C-alpha cells in the first residue's frame, strides 16, 4: 500500500511500544510490498490461494485454541519459550497478499528466550498474523490428548494442517511463477531496452 510519501508501506500491526520495530524488518517488508504491488494484477491466483489459507486458518483457530486450553496452561516448558520461532517467507507472502497487518518485528529470539510476542495471556498476535509454525504446532502432550480422543479427531486436525501447508507452497510457487513470467515479458527486461 502506498503511503502519503509515495513509498510502499505495509500495514504494521499496532505495536504499542511492547516490541521494538527493527529497521531491517521494516525495509524487508517494504520491499516485499513494493514487489507485490508492481505485480498485483498478475497475482490473482496467488491471492485466491491466500484467501483459501485464511479460511483454513480461521477454521483451525478454534480447534487449536481448544487443544491449547487443555494443555498449555499446565505446561512446565512452554513452546513459546523453549523453541526458536520465526516468521518465514510464506507467512509474509500470505500477509502481504491479503494486506493483513504485518507483525512489528521478526519473531526470532535466542534459544531459551521467550518469543517477543508472548504475554501472560498467550500470544499478542492475532491468530492469522502468527507464524505458521506456531499455528500448526502440536506438542507431544497435545498429540496424546488427540490420540485419546480417537483417530478421526487427530486425522481431521492433521488433515486440515496438511491441506493448509500444501496451499502455502502453492501460493509461493504461484507468486514466483507469475513474477518470473512478467519479468521475462516486460519491455524493460528485454536486451533491446538496455542499451
Question: Which residue ranges define each predicted feature?
Answer:
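Short loop/turn segments that flank or connect secondary-structure elements
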Residues: 1-194
